[in-house]
Amino acid sequence: MNIQNIIGIDGYTLIVYRSSDQLYRFSIIDSSGIAFNFDNIFLTAEEANIKGRNAIEIAFDFDKHPQY
């Protein structure tokens, strides 16, 4: 694994990395320290970064407005 990018957004951490198959993936760590790994694969780090930011936006909205 080769880390390409680490970004902090609204209490979340986005990690974009290249795996041994030379494809890119992302993981998110939330504000409580829980890591979320995704099965998506991307050809570029930029694409993984965009999708990771979108995932953080969804998680942030969900945490901001709980669905009890």
Model region roles, listed by residue range:
Residues M1-Y24:
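Short N-terminal "domain-start" leader segments
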Residues L43-D61:
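A short, charged, amphipathic alpha-helix used as a generic interaction element across diverse proteins
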Residues G33-E47:
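A short, exposed loop/beta-hairpin motif centered on an aromatic-Gly-Thr core
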Residues D30:
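Short, acidic, Ser/Thr-enriched surface-loop or helix-capping motifs
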Residues K64-Y68:
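Short acidic DE-rich linear segments
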